[in-house]
Amino acid sequence: MDTSSTFLVLALIKDHQLIGHVQKSCWKHQSEEIFPELTARMDRNGLKPSEIDQVVVSKGPGSYTGVRIAMTIAKVFCAMGNKPIYTVPTLELFAGKAAHVRVLLDARGQRVYTAVYENGQLLGDVSVQSCADIAGECGSENIVGDGHLVNREDVWPDLAQHFLDLEDQWHLEPNVHLVKPVYLKSTTAYLTGIH
């Protein structure tokens, strides 16, 4: 599950196949939509909560509140049901297994979370940069995510499929109670309203 951007993403995977999924834009409404959408997908597949044997959740970076929505639900479900919890970095989820791609996600305040991936592997670092700075670095790179922040087209991949594609890269967390979201802060001071 992922709620780190403008989307609510849920994927039900059984025997390495997607059996139910949703990816819908519902910015600031993910917390209202997640349970009805999850229940609908489970009902369509005849699943009860007790039959879910593990949960995979994106861990950030992304929208501060958004990352916490999916993370909290995943942690509570896994803790109550004594189920394993896996995590995947949000930008890695957006990149999937693309040959070469730069991920851009809105970090607010004219900033962007960004990283470059090659076949599902991170090249360099995940960072927060100003939109103006990163626009010059993008060149002709393939971009997924909030392209409009650098005067490019927004490109939204099939994130449910990416959860499945990245199955070999899910990280099993040893203790559900210690799983924490990843937050990045800009290295440049971000001040407003100071004269």
What are these model-derived regions, one by one?
Residues Q54-P84:
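DPxDG-like acidic metal-binding loop motif
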Residues L38-Q54, E137-E141:
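Phosphate/pyrophosphate-binding loops at sites that engage ATP/ADP/AMP, CoA/4′-phosphopantetheine
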Residues G20-Q23:
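Short amphipathic
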Residues W27-D43:
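N-terminal phosphate-binding loop and adjacent alpha-helix
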Residues L10, I34, I52-V55, F77:
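Hydrophobic packing within well-folded, soluble alpha/beta domains
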Residues N45-S50, A79-V88:
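Phosphate-handling active-site elements
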Residues L38, I73-F77, A95:
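Buried hydrophobic packing segments
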Residues M1-L18, H29-E32, Y86-H195:
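Oxyanion-binding and handling regions
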